[in-house]
From Swiss-Prot:
This is Olfactory receptor 7C2. One of its GO terms (cellular component) is plasma membrane. PROSITE patterns: G_PROTEIN_RECEP_F1_1, G_PROTEIN_RECEP_F1_2. Residues 47-54, 121-139, 218-236, 292-319 are cytoplasmic. The gene is OR7C2. It comes from Homo sapiens (Human).
Amino acid sequence: MERGNQTEVGNFLLLGFAEDSDMQLLLHGLFLSMYLVTIIGNLLIILTISSDSHLHTPMYFFLSNLSFADICFTSTTVPKMLVNIQTQSKMITFAGCLTQIFFFIAFGCLDNLLLTMTAYDRFVAICYPLHYTVIMNPRLCGLLVLGSWCISVMGSLLETLTILRLSFCTNMEIPHFFCDPSEVLKLACSDTFINNIVMYFVTIVLGVFPLCGILFSYSQIFSSVLRVSARGQHKAFSTCGSHLSVVSLFYGTGLGVYLSSAVTPPSRTSLAASVMYTMVTPMLNPFIYSLRNKDMKGSLGRLLLRATSLKEGTIAKLS
C-alpha cells in the first residue's frame, strides 16, 4: 500500500451524510436551524446570568461557562459541515482536521469538567449548607474554572500532537461529518499504539474520573436528602433535576457514540448518535436549565422585557 506523510497528503474527505441532493438540502436546513437555536439559546443563558445580580452565584457561574463551552463545542464541527453541504464539497485540509480535533477534544473535556464542578457545587450546597458560602467562594470558583480550561487544553494538545507523528495511507476518507479522532487514527499506516494509549489516558482522566466525581457527589446528595423532610427532598431534587438531566443526556449520547462505533463499522446509526452528542445535547441544555428553574425563567423574562422596551424606545425616537 502506498504510504505518505501528513504534509504530502494534504486533505481528508468527510463522507458525511446522504448523497441525494434533496436530502442534503433538507439536512442543511435542519442542521442550520439547530445550530442557530443552540447559539441563541446559550447566549441568552449567558446574558441572563450576567445581567441579573441575583444569579451571580457559583451554580450560575458554572452554568454560564458551560453555555459558552457548548457554543464553542458545537461551532467546532457544525459550520464546516454546513459549508461542505452547501458547496457539495467533502474536503478538509490536514491542518483544518487537526484544528477541529484539538477544539473538539478541548471543549468536550471542558464540558465534562464543568458538569463535575456543578455537581460539586450542588453537593456542598445540600450536604454542607452552613459552610456553602465559605467553601464555594468566588476565588475557588474562578480557580476551578481556570483549572478546567488549562487541563482540557493540555489534554487536547497532548492527543493532537501525537497525531502529527503519524503517516497516512492513500485512503483518506473519514466516514463521518467531522474529524473524529478515532476515525482519523484508523487511516494511519504507521503504528498508532502510542496514540491509542494517549487517547485512553485522556478519556479516563478527563472523562471517566469526572463522571465518577459526579456519581460520588450525587450519592452523597441522595444520602443526605433521604434524612430530611418531604418538602426538603422536593426542593433538593428540583435543584438537582436540571443538572442530572444534562449529565444523563451528555454522557448517554457520548457513550452511545463510542459504543456504536466500537461494536459496528461506521453507519447511519453512529452518525445519528454523533449528531445527538455534538448538536442536540448543546441545543437542549438551555431549555433544560431554564424551563425547570424559576429564577432563570424570571430573569430571562425580565431580560426580554428590557430588550423589547429598548427596541420600542429606539423606534419611537427614530420616528
